[in-house]
């Protein structure tokens, strides 16, 4: 079955995605740029 592989990919990608968002927001905060949201 593919489910163990799929769940492993999801469990691996979710923390990386969240960490990436935090790092991006932190770097933008450090540079003092106005976020274009």
Curated annotation (Swiss-Prot):
Gene Ontology biological process terms from the UniProt entry: cytochrome complex assembly; photosynthesis
Segments passing through the bilayer: 5-25
Gene Ontology CC: chloroplast thylakoid membrane; cytochrome b6f complex
Subunit structure of this chain's protein: The 4 large subunits of the cytochrome b6-f complex are cytochrome b6, subunit IV (17 kDa polypeptide, PetD), cytochrome f and the Rieske protein, while the 4 small subunits are PetG, PetL, PetM and PetN. The complex functions as a dimer.
Alphabetical list of Pfam families matching this protein: PetG
Family of this protein: Belongs to the PetG family.
Protein name: Cytochrome b6-f complex subunit 5
Organism: Oedogonium cardiacum
Membrane topology annotation: Single-pass membrane protein
Single GO term (MF): electron transporter, transferring electrons within cytochrome b6/f complex of photosystem II activity
Compartment annotation: Plastid, Chloroplast thylakoid membrane
Top-level taxonomy: Eukaryota, Viridiplantae, Chlorophyta, core chlorophytes, Chlorophyceae
Function: Component of the cytochrome b6-f complex, which mediates electron transfer between photosystem II (PSII) and photosystem I (PSI), cyclic electron flow around PSI, and state transitions. PetG is required for either the stability or assembly of the cytochrome b6-f complex.
Keyword field: Chloroplast, Electron transport, Membrane, Photosynthesis, Plastid, Thylakoid, Transmembrane, Transmembrane helix, Transport
InterPro entries per the UniProt record, alphabetical: Cyt_6/f_cplx_su5, Cyt_6/f_cplx_su5_sf
Superkingdom of this protein's organism: Eukaryota
